[in-house]
Design a protein with these regions (language model features):
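Eukaryotic all-alpha helical interaction scaffolds
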Residues: 93, 111-112
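Long, amphipathic alpha-helical coiled-coil segments characteristic
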Residues: 38-88, 95, 119-142
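C-terminal compact regulatory domains
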Residues: 1-31
Length: 145
């Protein structure tokens, strides 16, 4: 069990650092990693919403708004507060299966603790990029529902 925890910790560290992770596994929760072109894990989303399409649409819409709002607030916040916002985004992203957003948010959380402005700025740009990707995917998904 301890060895499995160590491997999971290593995968999380690799993902946060932007390094490749073990194929077929997510960096933090052991879920399957999707091909790069797939931004939202639709199977995970369906499981979380118990197959309710209206609930899936609702949580996707909520994530879209929340992530955009928190990202905007980060720009006027201290690194500590931005890290707290990133923590919220990471949890929400995991809920809808937006694994790249979750990993980027975890990276920003860690960068916020480092007192390294350059690393923090890179992590913020990465998070903004992955959120924009997820928002585009969400809008496309909602348009066909």
């Amino acid at each position: 069990m301890l060895e499995e925890d160590s491997k999971a910790s290593d995968r999380l560290s690799q993902a946060v650092a932007g390094a490749p992770i073990e194929p077929g596994r997510s960096p933090s929760l052991g879920q399957t990693v999707l091909p790069p072109e797939q931004t939202i894990d639709l199977a995970h989303l369906a499981r979380m919403a118990c197959g309710e399409k209206s609930l899936e649409a609702e949580v996707l819409s909520l994530f879209d708004r929340q992530a955009g709002m928190l990202l905007a607030r980060m720009q006027q916040s201290s690194p500590k507060v931005a890290g707290d916002f990133a923590h919220t985004i990471a949890g929400s992203a995991r809920g809808i299966g937006a694994w790249k957003v979750a990993a980027a948010a975890e990276g920003l959380e860690l960068a916020a603790r480092d007192c390294d402005p350059a690393r923090f700025a890179r992590a913020h740009r990465r998070l903004a990029s992955t959120i924009a990707e997820a928002q585009a995917a969400i809008r496309a998904l909602l348009a066909v529902r």
